[in-house]
């Protein structure tokens, strides 16, 4: 891992490069093709989008990583609505993965979110990676994932308090922001703006 990287806020001039980066990173990972590049494209105009936490990572003048945050809520069992953040997509360029850049970008992003006074981040991820940055299973905070049947595996659903004790005494249901839900036809139309890539059905895909 080289140390001459920079992390800064995304600018409009970065949009296409970021979308290309995300497309390459997620292509055929969770589904044949991917939708994450279109998700980012639409999230930028969403009211829940946090512009102060929309980051790119550069190395040698090239954008090699990105991360973003959205505002959402926990619908608490006692009737309260608890403001929280969700995160992602987050990615690093394929040729630079597993070299430490992802954790650096993640930790920087979380520090900036905490500095804004925000209380907690909840999202879907792998505990083996995100646990190294302080995430735990959301079930440990008594927070449930929306629409997940009781007793179903929720090990993908993670949480990190940015303010210690922010979720003390709270139980409830996390809501994914609507901006993450996109129509497949819209994804297909948007994807035609990019170089053609082969969609493959591969083992381990979840969609």
List the predicted regions and their residue ranges.
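Active-site rim helix/loop that mediates acceptor-substrate recognition in acyltransferases
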Residues: 19-22, 26-68, 73
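A short beta-loop-alpha structural element at the N-terminal edge
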Residues: 6-18
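Acidic/histidine-enriched, glycine/proline-rich intrinsically disordered or flexible terminal extensions
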Residues: 164-207
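Conserved acetyl-CoA-binding loop-helix of GNAT-fold acetyltransferases
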Residues: 87, 92, 98-111, 123
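Conserved glycine-rich acetyl-CoA-binding loop
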Residues: 62, 80, 93-104, 116, ...
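Conserved active-site alpha-helix within GNAT-family acetyltransferase domains
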Residues: 115-118, 125-152
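A conserved beta-turn-beta hairpin within the catalytic core of GNAT-like acetyltransferases
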Residues: 73-86, 97
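Internal, conserved structured core segments that host functional sites
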Residues: 52-53, 57, 88-91, 118, ...
